[in-house]
Amino acid sequence: MSAAGRRGLIVAIDGPSGAGKSTITKLLADRLGYIHIDTGAMFRTVALAASRAGIAPDNDASLAGLCADLEIAFVRNNGCCRVTANGEDVTDAIRTPAISALTSAISARKVVRDVLLRLQRHMAREGGVILEGRDIGTVVFPDADVKFFLSASVEERGRRRYLELKAKGQEVSLDETIAAVARRDEQDSGREHAPLRRADDAVDIDSTGLSIEEVLDRMESIVRERERATPGA
């Protein structure tokens, strides 16, 4: 689609697990008036559906059939973005430690990635969107208008995840949560298909020790500058 026919830019935010991508992307989308497409939530939704159906993460034939029958959508409810699977709100169900662990294995399967890749590109075709994940700027939208690589130290990311899980009433330890984040990094960086990798033209944002507002201010400034330089955006 030409720039003149678009509603805005395509913004890609990549980074490791626990870097705060979902929180930052949602808030940045609100500031910009863009749509937030949470690609990580899409993989988590497939993982949840596979878990419920008893499908092993290496059973490509069954995963293909599962994806074909799975309708994933993002809807706004009272100002909050919710994830649905075939009409069921699964926003909270996809955020458990068990589903988090399964998601890394599921997201490594090419059959799953291919289906979700087509869906993500379809959702973002008219621009005015922010997508976050681990390979948005390298695989899904290598020509995205703005690319960010959002990161933080393993300890910082583990601490954030620990506090998030505790707030939900889950019994976890800080050391175990940090170790789980480190394992996820290793899995995501070493997988065969679309491993976690920083795009060469991405802007690095290290959020260690920074407030959410500080991170948002910097990222919004970069996007606004690109908007002014892009006709039709």
Curated annotation (Swiss-Prot):
It holds the Pfam family Cytidylate_kin. Its main location: cytoplasm. The keyword Nucleotide-binding applies. It catalyses: CMP + ATP = CDP + ADP; dCMP + ATP = dCDP + ADP. GO terms for molecular function: (d)CMP kinase activity; ATP binding; CMP kinase activity; dCMP kinase activity. Keywords: ATP-binding, Cytoplasm, Kinase, Nucleotide-binding, Transferase. Belongs to the cytidylate kinase family. Type 1 subfamily. ATP binds at G15, P16, S17, G18, A19, G20, K21, S22, T23. This is Cytidylate kinase. One of its GO terms (biological process) is nucleobase-containing small molecule interconversion. Residues 183-202 are annotated as: Disordered. It is found in: Cytoplasm. Its EC number is 2.7.4.25. Residues 183-201 have a biased composition (Basic and acidic residues). It is an enzyme of class 2 (transferase). It comes from Geobacter sulfurreducens (strain ATCC 51573 / DSM 12127 / PCA). GO terms for cellular component: cytosol. InterPro entries: Cytidylate_kin, Cytidylate_kinase_dom, P-loop_NTPase.
